[in-house]
Amino acid sequence: MKSLSGYVESITFRNEENGYTVLTLSYGKKEMKCTGNFGYISEGEYLEIEGEEVFHDIYGEQIKVTSYKVIPATDELSLKKYLGSGAIKGLGAVLANRIVDKFGEDTLRIVEEEPERLAEIRGITIRKAMDICEQVEEKKDMRDVMIFLQGYGISPTLSNKIYTMYGQKVYDIIKTNPYKLADDLSGIGFKTADEIARRAGVEVNASIRIKSGMCYALSDASLSGHTYLPKEKLVEKTINLLGLRDQYLNADGTYNMDLLDNCFTELVLEKKLILKNIEEKDAVFLSTYYYTELNIARMLLELNISTPEDDYIMGVKLDTIEKLSGVELDDLQRKAVIETQNNGITIITGGPGTGKTTTINAIIQMFEADGLEVSLAAPTGRAAKRMNEATGHEAKTIHRLLEISGGASEETGRDEIDAKFGRNEQNPLETDVIIVDEMSMVDTFLVHALLKAITIGTRVVFVGDINQLASVGPGNVLRDIIESEQFSVVRLTKVFRQAGESGIVTNAHKINKGEQVALDNSMGDFLYIERENAQMALNATIGLMMSKLPQYVEAKPMDIQVLTPMRGGILGVNSLNEQLQKYINPQDENKREREIAGVIFREGDKVMQIKNNYQLEWEQRSEGGRIYDSGTGIFNGDMGIITTINNTTNTMEVVFDDDRYVIYDSKQAEELELAYAITIHKSQGSEYPAVIMPLVSGVSMLMTRNLLYTGVTRAKKCVCIVGRKETFSAMIANEDQHRRYSGLKWQLVNYYNEEQ
């Protein structure tokens, strides 16, 4: 181990997330590169460090710092370096030298105790003197907090958030209730707060720990799509989370509920939790989710105004539309169009080939014939693009329709709840009719934001396939609306002749019904290649991608999509992307590349955004480079191509499917992943010329019927199953669907009954 004392001459690099810093320490007439987690320090500060001497191939001798201490500046040289480092706004080297030359080693005492005396220096007013004093005190307080929090394993970025929100109160919060950090701030989850609490000496069965654990258990359940949990499941999840099973489990297998019930009752009285009876069981909601679903129910029922039209007039209008469009609607399609005229809310659901698009076009024509304005929307950019191509009308993502204007608040960082929309109750959408496609993908918070921007009297049409996978976010919106039986629902069931000749459509309906599919390659758009193990399936997938399918479906390899149920393993997303990249976009001296979080990204790579980012700025450009639109927000599932990588500025540019260009910095780029292969969940709302699905084996909870159905229906011209027939058949037979505990259906029925 080596010890050194010196000034921070310069900071070369700092990772704001984890505090890893590369700096140059000046001691005597020498300098030394130092690396380590330094937290909040500035150039010019005096450090005592201890660490291990290492030798870097490029940068030479360094010290890998294991511990350090900030020593307050006392001698004139260190005072000049600290005050003149630029860390204090408005104070440069010249003024710093004047201050220290006048006050010498008494400078910091003067700044802290008699700041008005700084005005004795030429160039410093009383106001500026007080500002310098405040900054020095603020930096001292902040540094003390950073060092204090670092002792609890908290990163500099989170420490900065904590200090910004609480200031000097943070000391009391850590000592009395560190779980408040998890309640108030994103990025400090329950597990982080629990570790802080452990270090602070909080007992494992303390009521503050149990209460926070219950809230976290419900929040964590929302990541699996739940908006509530039955009380017994919440108790079990909380006890397992807190590691209290042995302490609370009785001999008969029940739990000792005394302390748990006390904590639960307190949370209900504090209105953090809401307790209701659903399906004759105690259902527990986080208050946010309960009131969000309650408001959704209220708004839907208020919008559902019945305005019956004359049947004869409606029939004449439909006949005219059929003549003008040259399309004959079947009885269910006609009914769907009529229902949208008669009701404020209409739901149209159906599988592939049942004429949903034809029906949407007829609905648009009917309303426009009456001089009404129709707006089209979908949850993803790809789905909106498909809607636009199918109707010839502009379709926007729901986020863009609502004019997303930024995301999470800086204090909390909670994206979905704090997302800011330009369209809302005060500034509603100016339209007569709204048609939303791919409604099965829309989660609780997004439909809540949409409904808030719709005025009573506007017609709303929800279109979707109820058998697709549920939304990634919490809730079961489309299914709950349908099953509430409070609205007009039209189920399109007829598969039209042209669609019926498609192997994709025919087999998708068979899969949905649980009927086995003959993998005999008798239909040219539904192919099967038998491979017994993962490596063989991988090789076949690469061969299909590079040589067979592009010519067969007249598409580039880049446009063909590999879909898989899983992320891990040879046939998981991570491995598939690594292998496919080598063939589709191989290393080239003319292509710049960059490693981010262990993944190589290269110019020309196909990538996907994997989380909503409401702050990312984008611009749309014409072929000549003229910017014709701009905005903020790139969303989970958006796909694009890396156009340029700039290793000087550590940025890369991605152009997304709808011609939005985005520049990512290093941190933002961690929200991207290669997208030659994606999970079936991520493919929702998209359509590809061809889909390859490698299916050799997998855990039963992933290998389900509706997952297979969703994957198959993503293909437009051809789907190719690669793997084992037994696995394919088992997926069809596995109708186990992950049960989502959502309260919207109950809210709709309950609210309706109360209003009657």
Task: Show where each model-derived region lies.
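Accessory, non-ATPase domains that flank or precede helicase/AAA+ motor cores in DNA-metabolism machines
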Residues: 1-313, 756
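Loop/turn-to-beta-strand initiation segments
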Residues: 373, 430-433, 457-461, 718
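ASCE P-loop NTPase motor cores of helicases and related translocases
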Residues: 274-433, 488-497, 504-528
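Walker B catalytic acidic pair
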Residues: 438, 464
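Loop/turn positions that initiate beta-strands
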Residues: 44-46, 604, 637
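Conserved helicase motor core of P-loop NTPases
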Residues: 466-632, 751
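C-terminal accessory regions
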Residues: 630-631, 636-756
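Short, conserved "post-DEAD/DEAH" coupling segment immediately C-terminal to helicase motif II
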Residues: 444-458, 478-481
